[in-house]
Amino acid sequence: MQFTNLGRTGLKVSRVCLGTNMFGAGYVDDGRAISVIHSILEHGINFVDTADAYHDGLSEVVVGKAVKSRRHDYVIATKGHFPTGPGVNDRGSSRK
């Protein structure tokens, strides 16, 4: 697997990233999704993409469960702009 620098963060990420938009909503069984996330390390992939907007944050929950025991091995990219609730601080990059 080829790796590249993630901007100026000092992190090295695989050039292939696992997208998790289908995880957490029943499209893919959570157990299977977790197995997929575990298996990518065997193929040299350390980069996982998710978002709070993917199925009301359920994708992030599945990713969290999957990486819990080996968190230091993964680089997780997420997005945090879309509304997650009705409150004034439930969207965007608020401090909350």
What positions do the PLM features span?
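Glycine/proline-rich, positively charged
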Residues: 27, 86-96
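N-terminal binding-site loop/beta-alpha segment at the start of enzyme catalytic domains
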Residues: 1-75, 82-84
